[in-house]
């Protein structure tokens, strides 16, 4: 039995310097684990088995480190893994103590944000955007009054324009002229003056009578 175990383990111990596939390594390791009690009885076979296990573990560790380093190199994360060198250590951990700046040297002052008015396309500060939008669109109290006044003025002007146009059209249909209108107006004015003068004369006569 010992000779058979020796024949099985001797090739494994002799070829420790060669490269085995993963399946072969797992098979050899399982064989050593199964025959562990028998290997203890033979010191030579035990040394060969221990050397083989050590070499297999070393190959696995080296291969893992190599694959991880290759991956970091390809992805560009190798510099982050290396860290900062000793010559740049002081500058890397420099703390900024200037006013209005944080420890990293970034400004802490709040920048004023500007908003674009959708009605007039002007840049307005964010704090004044709401009142500006009310005034610009006529939605505030004062703005609504001004807008209603403007609307009433426009309606009045349009009404006067329409009445003037209808008056001109009606005057043209009756066939009257400006001269005839002036004559009628002057005659009416004379009649009013004559009636007023007669009334004044009558009142003066009545005041002069004695009873």
Curated annotation (Swiss-Prot):
A zinc finger (SGF11-type) spans 115-136. It comes from the Eukaryota. It is found in: Nucleus, Nucleoplasm; Cytoplasm. One of its GO terms (biological process) is regulation of transcription by RNA polymerase II. Its main location: nucleus. The modification Phosphoserine is found at residue 187. One of its GO terms (cellular component) is SAGA complex. Keywords: Activator, Chromatin regulator, Cytoplasm, Metal-binding, mRNA transport, Nucleus, Phosphoprotein, Protein transport, Transcription, Transcription regulation, Translocation, Transport, Zinc, Zinc-finger. InterPro entries: SAGA_su_Sgf11 (IPR013246), SGF11 (IPR051078). The keyword Ion transport does not apply. Residues 149-211 are annotated as: Disordered. Residues 157-166, 197-211 have a biased composition (Low complexity). GO terms for molecular function: transcription coactivator activity; zinc ion binding. Component of some SAGA transcription coactivator-HAT complexes, at least composed of Ada2b, not/nonstop, Pcaf/Gcn5, Sgf11 and Spt3. Within the SAGA complex, Sgf11, e(y)2, and not/nonstop form an additional subcomplex of SAGA called the DUB module (deubiquitination module). Interacts directly with not/nonstop. Interacts with the AMEX complex component xmas-2. Interacts with Cbp80; important for promoter recruitment of Sgf11 that is not associated with the DUB module. PANTHER family: ATAXIN-7-LIKE PROTEIN 3. Component of the transcription regulatory histone acetylation (HAT) complex SAGA, a multiprotein complex that activates transcription by remodeling chromatin and mediating histone acetylation and deubiquitination. Within the SAGA complex, participates in a subcomplex that specifically deubiquitinates histone H2B. The SAGA complex is recruited to specific gene promoters by activators, where it is required for transcription. Required for nuclear receptor-mediated transactivation. Binds independently on SAGA to promoters in an RNA-dependent manner. Belongs to the SGF11 family. HAMAP family: Sgf11. The long N-terminal helix forms part of the 'assembly lobe' of the SAGA deubiquitination module. This is SAGA-associated factor 11 homolog 1. The gene is Sgf11-1.
